[in-house]
Swiss-Prot record:
Subunit composition and interactions: Part of the 50S ribosomal subunit; part of the 5S rRNA/L5/L18/L25 subcomplex. Contacts the 5S rRNA. Binds to the 5S rRNA independently of L5 and L18.
Protein name per UniProt: Large ribosomal subunit protein bL25
GO CC field: ribonucleoprotein complex; ribosome
Alphabetical keyword list: Ribonucleoprotein, Ribosomal protein, RNA-binding, rRNA-binding
Pfam families to which the protein is assigned, alphabetical: Ribosomal_L25p
Family from the record: Belongs to the bacterial ribosomal protein bL25 family.
GO biological process: translation
Lineage: Bacteria, Pseudomonadati, Pseudomonadota, Gammaproteobacteria, Enterobacterales
Gene: rplY
Top-level taxonomic group: Bacteria
InterPro entries in UniProt: Rbsml_bL25/Gln-tRNA_synth_N, Ribosomal_bL25/Gln-tRNA_synth, Ribosomal_bL25_short, Ribosomal_L25_dom
GO molecular function: 5S rRNA binding; structural constituent of ribosome
Organism: Blochmanniella pennsylvanica (strain BPEN)
Amino acid sequence: MLTIKANLRIYHKKGATRRLRKQNKCPAVIYNRGQEPSIPIILNQNDILHPEAVIQLYKNNVILLFIENQQPITVKVQELQYHPFKSKLIHIDFTRV
């Protein structure tokens, strides 16, 4: 099982996500089942683009996210969005398992 560290994302607008990407971070969202609100998070590009991590992301395996000051969350990848010509992720959507 792949484990990734994440931080909560406070700012959600376009300019804030651009600044994150320039800092080698990747914005992501964890979608919950039912009425619970989604959780916006920030991931480090180096943690995600590690060769072992890429394989786990594409296999659609269960991933354990450690978010600061919270219980670990088990998720699956719903969607990956890559930059058109750079080898960077633009955004990831997770679904809680």
